[in-house]
Amino acid sequence: MRQKTLDVLEFDKIKSFVASETISDLGREKVSKMSPATDFETVEFQMNETDEISQIYNKHRLPSLSGLAKISPLIHRANIGGVLNVTELNLVKRLIQVQNQFKTFYNQLLEEDEQVVKYPILNDKMNQLPILSDLFQEINEKCDTHDLYDSASYELQGIRSKISSTNQRIRQNLDRIVKSQANQKKLSDAIITVRNDRNVIPVKAEYRQDFKGIVHDQSASGQTLYIEPSSIVEMNNQISRLRNDEAVERERILTELTGMVAAEADGCLIAESVMGQIDFLTAKARYARSIKGTKPTFYKDRTVYLPNAYHPLLNKDTVVANTIEFVDDIETVIITGPNTGGKTVTLKTLGLIIIMAQSGLLIPTLDGSQLSVFENVYCDIGDEQSIEQSLSTFSSHMKNIVEILQETDKNSLVLFDELGAGTDPSEGAALAMSILDHVREIGSLVMATTHYPELKAYSYNREGVMNASVEFDVNTLSPTYKLLMGVPGRSNAFDISRKLGLSLGIINKAKTMIGTDEQEINSMIESLEKNSKRVDEQRIELDRLLKEARKTHDDLEHQYEQYKSYEKKLMDEAKEKANQRVKSATKEADSILKELRTLRDQKGADVKEHELIDKKKQLDDQYEAKSLKQNVQKQKYDEIHAGDEVKVLSYGQKGEVLELVSEEEAVVQMGIIKMKLPIEDLEKTKKKKEKPSKMVTRQNRQTIKTELHLRGYRYEEAVSELDQYIDQAVLSNYEQVYIIHGKGTGALQKAVQNHLNKHKSVKSYRGGMPSEGGFGVTVAELK
């Protein structure tokens, strides 16, 4: 894509914002190379890649990437025989640590949330990460942040131990000298210091002859000599030899560790590449959150729909968002309206958002944006007059337009700002229309701004062209920056003049001079503006309702998944309990069989072997392995009748058969829900004997329903009605009843459940299953 376009649309500023969100040079390097892709698959992949990280970033706290650094130069040096120092080895160690932490984080996501498989790109990156635990362990055990540990090798530990003990002896020797009363007046200061890596004491020059040893230095005034006493010369020499030995051993260990790094060179480079990309994508995610970015959907057919788009470089708290759309077969949009009304900002918003999207950045629009992939974006925006070339504004623009017309094609987007401006209005308007015709013949998508009234009629004479305008508030005498698609701009001169106090006589006379047609056009445009405003308001309301519907759908879907998961858990637990019982029974049977055989052998009891084996097999056949699917006994058509109590296997709920529709289907009542279900999904259950009732007759039960409707009740009424109903239900020997309170604000549901929680006749309660009415129902189990 043209660099000139990226510069005019200020894409470099977007990149600088993203770069500020990176942690490492690896991420910043990738941001610096970020540019719009033009291949459909690449654009879609980059967007999905960013969206995956953004989803995780918005839900979870990502592991820290601090300390991540570029190590490829170090790997190269290790491969050609160089030796890495401790600081460089720590950079390798930190890379491994960062990748391990991120992989652990991702694995925890997999365990906690099965939905994480919807991140296939990130999953692939995590699978690419190599196992470098051994290398990490070696570096970690031998290096701290500044130096090798004493324990890095047996030899190093021994050398440093000798250095320490020798230094201690030297210190003790010098302490005796400097603390001696006889030497107090001979020393410049009672301290031990170091010169030329040797331990020395500061002696006054006039007492030089009193101290045998080597003079290593003197003060600037010459009054103090730094002398190494002869008593410690040999010990200092020993320290020097040990320091050399330490350096040799240190080099050997670093060489060994560097060799290990070289052996894992490929893995380290893969880790660097993946974690650098993670840093880059995380920076994109952070920036997306700051602009409330959303993911667009890309189409191979030419499409542009940007709901409530705004320019990301403007203050999002004050900028006016506009829906930019090329509807149906529209290929050219012409924006008219007042200067400083936001026409140029609209052009830049469209161009910049497309560049951002094709660079894998989430875009500043509402959800639901749709875009196609453009091979290039061309723009002629702003005053690019060249002083060096002595070009006028018109000439400068025309030179740029000529270049655009030579390069653009049907897969390009072209943005013209004030097309044809800077010359005679009639000639400029004619040129503008001719240029637009030419670009339309090429097939490019075009958005242009103009103040020429001739271009308002342009769209009515050509197919695929739409007018648009920026709104002007005549009451405040200022633009609203609101884009009106499909509505041409109109002159506000008369309204503004009247608002400013110009006499109506002058205004009315002026109106007669412009002709009836022009006045009718302005009236028509004013009507279109009002209709457009009303449509926008309706669209906003529809968007709100759609969001609410989607949220409700997602909530219900999530609850259904929870229900299915809970149902599976209960089934597994039931199977496990059943298996344990069968195992116990089998074990008991084995014991009995053993006793019977023993009895037969001892007393000759008349028990046949094959009969014992048959009994044992009957018990074994009852066992159901946990891994097998639920083995349910299917009821034949002639075994289920209307009025039978059954268990609906797919829902795990009890119900009553109301009607047999055919040999395959029956109508079943489950609580307040009637459903037509396959007979193979039904399991006949035994009716429980009713408890005798002293208070009411059997006839009374039939008059009490299993559900109580409380929708529309106030709190006091609902509680009173609920108490009476529960008393009647208990007397009727009901085990379970349904309280229907509806969803609403949830206040009535809360009141009902709080009261049930305290009621002495209520054993437990729960929210309704989806098959029972969901949130709008509470199911109470009675004592």
Curated annotation (Swiss-Prot):
One of its GO terms (biological process) is mismatch repair. Keywords: ATP-binding, DNA-binding, Endonuclease, Hydrolase, Nuclease, Nucleotide-binding, RNA-binding, rRNA-binding. The keyword rRNA processing does not apply. ATP binds at G337, P338, N339, T340, G341, G342, K343, T344. One of its GO terms (molecular function) is ATP binding. It is an enzyme of class 3 (hydrolase). Its EC number is 3.1.-.-, 3.6.4.-. Gene3D superfamilies: 3.30.1370.110, P-loop containing nucleotide triphosphate hydrolases (3.40.50.300). Homodimer. Binds to stalled ribosomes, contacting rRNA. HAMAP family: MutS2. This is Endonuclease MutS2. It comes from Staphylococcus haemolyticus (strain JCSC1435). The gene is mutS2.
